[in-house]
Amino acid sequence: MKKNKTAEKYLAQVITPKWDIIFGSTVALGVILFFFGWGWGYYFSILIVIVGAAGFILARSARVSDEDYLGIIDRILADNGIEKNASRGEIILSSFLMKDSEVTRGIDKTLRSGRYCTAEFVFSKGECKIKMHTIDVKDGSVTCDTYTVPLTAVPAIQSEDVETRFGTVKQNTLVFPDTGIAIPVDTNSADVDEVIRRFGR
């Protein structure tokens, strides 16, 4: 399957302020020379500012933005008819899968990976139907698993340490004991607490 070059680039890039600092300092030097230079320094300062500004813009434009990467995920969801927003009576949990995935740190410092999971919870009398989609962002493939769980089940959050190139991170999973069902979740989402609250009855 053809890989998405933009997704590949995003997952491989490492955001460092090095070039921003270098080109920003170059612009600052040019401005100082412009105001305090004399003779050829005055004209040379204009060239320094132009070079520094151009380098700064090129360094920034060479990056794949967080919005571009999230846009790829949104397109995959839409192309496969996967709902991003919950309908009435449903809850949708979404999270990046850190375990066994290529992990990167975005421009906004948030950790993201090459695999994205959504789980749709549809509650009815006595049971809950769960439809979980796992997306491989680079190749655009989607797998789907469907489960039916009684509302008497008592789910729990399990945390696992996962080693990445950015150090150790937590992989949180919503687990239904004795079922083999494990759903990656973002525990910062209030919807996770709401899902747990609806079980154990």
What are these regions (language model features)?
Residues 16, 20-24, 195, 200-201:
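IQ-motif-like calmodulin-binding regions
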Residues 125-127, 180:
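Structural motif
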Residues 134-138:
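Short, surface-exposed beta-strand-loop junctions and turns on beta-sheet-rich folds
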